[in-house]
Amino acid sequence: MPQIEKDYIDTGKMKYVFMDFPLPMHGQAMKASEAALCAGDQNKFWEMHDRLFANQNALSPEALSKHAEALGLDTTQFKECLESGKHAAQIKAAMAEGQKAGITGTPGFLLGFVEADGKVKATKKISGAVPYANFKTTIDELLSSKK
């Protein structure tokens, strides 16, 4: 991702939108996604996201609280958010959108354009952890087709 950010996002050639897609086979993935969004309520989404990915064996409710504490979050607010399921509908909507676009696993990437109505029209899909060169080829093809 860092090279894509440098070459395409930071230069304004493309925009990056992250959508949660917790897989049902991972029993704690949904709560982990909610935890990242609850951390986002306190402006720490990416910090929590990265921490959870780095600690995938520590996703129990107790571990999520410890992650929140380590990030300096207001733990009372974080726990209330997590227990309320405040972000569950948002995550389920993102999953439905991803499934509709053909995403079946993670990581999954949709590349496309923003239409006049503000909706993203995905024209290419990349599945799995692939090398930067694959992204570069696909992105460059899309960008040149839009000229």
Language model region names:
Residues 1-7, 65-147:
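C-terminal cap of thioredoxin/glutaredoxin-like
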Residues 1-69, 74:
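Structural alpha/beta surface segment adjacent to cysteine/selenocysteine redox centers
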